[in-house]
Amino acid sequence: GGTTDYAVAIYFEAVRHRRYCSYLREDTALAMMYMPDALRAAVELMEADPQRLRHRNAYNVTAMTLTPRSIAAAIRRRIAGFVLDVAVDPRRQAIADSWPDSLDDSAARREWGWRPQFDLETMTGDMLANLSKTDPTQKDSRCLVTSWEND
């Protein structure tokens, strides 16, 4: 699995077992975005006024900086007794430690009005509501993606 897979798996495991074992330290912070915001960002950029776009080929977009601990706390506010265990995978931890914990998306905010609609609380509510309605053994179409940076 990938380094950021935990950010989706934690929700599936919360619904299935009320417990998740993180392979990253619980304080490992990474910039992330919920898929509905990522899709909306792409559409908004395509529909933006070209006269306002100065960085035509590269924009950072981000929504939130998350840790396994912060996601677990948000889940715990909705699922009493949820437990976060930690068993660090040194390889994935080293990768996560090499990534930025935040991105500067001020150009997107300034030039085409980018604003995420989901924060940790609204994303957690949406994820848990959707997973509770579906078979949690099946992958949901909404997922969390790591915010990206284009060169």
Mark where each language-model region is:
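NAD(P)-dependent short-chain dehydrogenase/reductase
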Residues: 1-29, 35-37
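C-terminal substrate-binding subdomain of Rossmann-fold SDR/epimerase-dehydratase oxidoreductases
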Residues: 23-25, 31-151
